[in-house]
Amino acid sequence: MQLLTIGINHHTAPVALRERVAFPLEQIKPALVTFKNVFLGPQAPNTPEAAILSTCNRTELYCATDDRAAREGAVRWLSEYHRIPVDELAPHVYALPQSEAVRHAFRVASGLDSMVLGETQILGQMKDAVRTATEAGALGTYLNQLFQRTFAVAKEVRGTTEIGTQSVSMAAAAVRLAQRIFEKVSDQRVLFIGAGEMIELCATHFAAQGPRELVVANRTAERGQRLAERFNGRAMPLADLPTRMHEFDIIVSCTASTLPIIGLGAVERAVKARRHRPIFMVDLAVPRDIEPEVGKLKDVFLYTVDDLGAIVREGNASRQAAVAQAEAIIETRVQNFMQWLDTRSVVPVIRHMHTQADALRRAEVEKAQKLLARGDDPAAVLEALSQALTNKLIHGPTSALNRVNGADRDSLIDLMRGFYQHAPRSNDQSGH
């Protein structure tokens, strides 16, 4: 079985492409079934395995398969599933085999490959991806082991390095940008659209600035109300957004919608109602919640996750010592995992040896039982049984020794000597 990771992320593709390749949560299970069965070879000797990790910054397919053409098949499947021409998608896709796939998984879970260096959200997202793949019946021995090792490595990296300290989060970056637009965030009305983890983080940072008003709009009114109450804010129905958008100076949106929920026309009307007072908008969703054309409006300052990345990277540069320490830990753990993977390659051979040996044993036992039933001397039957088993079990190694010559023969002799610890060396003439 070969490990393979196929994907795109914020390093290789802009948000405009990433949002087209993202998988909504409810689509992942059926997508896994299709991907695993159609493109990883349901007739393969070993059952193929797969998992899909889809976040704001990456969409990745983790595979374990015998199919040597899995790389091309995975890219083609991703292209067909999302209806994106292969020629458009392929230049942005990375394919990481074996140790590269292992190293990548360890780095992702440890926060080393994130836009926010050392952030912890990705670890939870990866665990969710594993849970979904397990529920879909898409995981097996190889990926299960990979992900369990991945989570252990992430825990070790975060526990023994300072990779997560003093990081500038996306939420903190959003506040910094708002402070560039408005002299005082405390004088502004802030609207949060959504009620997930990212919105909760943003609300925490903005609430610390003491805004004039904090409002949460969410599809599920009860969840939005709970979040608003945590920050002494209030909730409003999401359906009221088009008619009330003009009330807010700062709008932060991050929902799971597959289509934009804020269109150009609605924002144009809001700007007009505000008499062209500026609106600061942050779209943290992938796919995007706000139509990108909104960013062209004169009085609107629209930022996406990619835009916030520049501010985040400023804070990343100061922690390169922690990065080097984390990379060293990961490299050691990659080598350990590859050693385990190498041992797995002999499992089919060992299983076959057991099957063959057991077949020989059963055949000889059956023969012995017939002789005993016939009344033959038990001692003679046992002697014949043991002699037959001995001859048949050493027949393979003996034949191999007689077939090979030269260096191959010497290597095989050394190998056999290891099997049979008391075998005399070839230069021992004592006959013992």
Curated annotation (Swiss-Prot):
<dbReference type="InterPro" id="IPR036291">
    <property type="entry name" value="NAD(P)-bd_dom_sf"/>
</dbReference>
<feature type="site" description="Important for activity">
    <location>
        <position position="104"/>
    </location>
</feature>
<dbReference type="InterPro" id="IPR006151">
    <property type="entry name" value="Shikm_DH/Glu-tRNA_Rdtase"/>
</dbReference>
<keyword id="KW-0521">NADP</keyword>
<protein>
    <recommendedName>
        <fullName>Glutamyl-tRNA reductase</fullName>
        <ecNumber>1.2.1.70</ecNumber>
    </recommendedName>
</protein>
<dbReference type="InterPro" id="IPR036453">
    <property type="entry name" value="GluRdtase_dimer_dom_sf"/>
</dbReference>
<dbReference type="InterPro" id="IPR036343">
    <property type="entry name" value="GluRdtase_N_sf"/>
</dbReference>
<feature type="binding site">
    <location>
        <begin position="55"/>
        <end position="58"/>
    </location>
    <ligand>
        <name>substrate</name>
    </ligand>
</feature>
<dbReference type="InterPro" id="IPR000343">
    <property type="entry name" value="4pyrrol_synth_GluRdtase"/>
</dbReference>
<dbReference type="Pfam" id="PF00745">
    <property type="entry name" value="GlutR_dimer"/>
</dbReference>
<feature type="binding site">
    <location>
        <begin position="119"/>
        <end position="121"/>
    </location>
    <ligand>
        <name>substrate</name>
    </ligand>
</feature>
<dbReference type="InterPro" id="IPR015896">
    <property type="entry name" value="4pyrrol_synth_GluRdtase_dimer"/>
</dbReference>
<keyword id="KW-0627">Porphyrin biosynthesis</keyword>
<feature type="active site" description="Nucleophile">
    <location>
        <position position="56"/>
    </location>
</feature>
<comment type="function">
    <text>Catalyzes the NADPH-dependent reduction of glutamyl-tRNA(Glu) to glutamate 1-semialdehyde (GSA).</text>
</comment>
<dbReference type="InterPro" id="IPR015895">
    <property type="entry name" value="4pyrrol_synth_GluRdtase_N"/>
</dbReference>
<keyword id="KW-0560">Oxidoreductase</keyword>
<feature type="binding site">
    <location>
        <position position="125"/>
    </location>
    <ligand>
        <name>substrate</name>
    </ligand>
</feature>
<dbReference type="InterPro" id="IPR018214">
    <property type="entry name" value="GluRdtase_CS"/>
</dbReference>
<feature type="binding site">
    <location>
        <begin position="194"/>
        <end position="199"/>
    </location>
    <ligand>
        <name>NADP(+)</name>
    </ligand>
</feature>
<dbReference type="Pfam" id="PF01488">
    <property type="entry name" value="Shikimate_DH"/>
</dbReference>
<feature type="binding site">
    <location>
        <position position="114"/>
    </location>
    <ligand>
        <name>substrate</name>
    </ligand>
</feature>
<dbReference type="GO" id="GO:0050661">
    <property type="term" value="F:NADP binding"/>
</dbReference>
<dbReference type="GO" id="GO:0008883">
    <property type="term" value="F:glutamyl-tRNA reductase activity"/>
</dbReference>
<dbReference type="Pfam" id="PF05201">
    <property type="entry name" value="GlutR_N"/>
</dbReference>
<comment type="subunit">
    <text>Homodimer.</text>
</comment>
<dbReference type="GO" id="GO:0019353">
    <property type="term" value="P:protoporphyrinogen IX biosynthetic process from glutamate"/>
</dbReference>
<comment type="pathway">
    <text>Porphyrin-containing compound metabolism; protoporphyrin-IX biosynthesis; 5-aminolevulinate from L-glutamyl-tRNA(Glu): step 1/2.</text>
</comment>
<comment type="similarity">
    <text>Belongs to the glutamyl-tRNA reductase family.</text>
</comment>
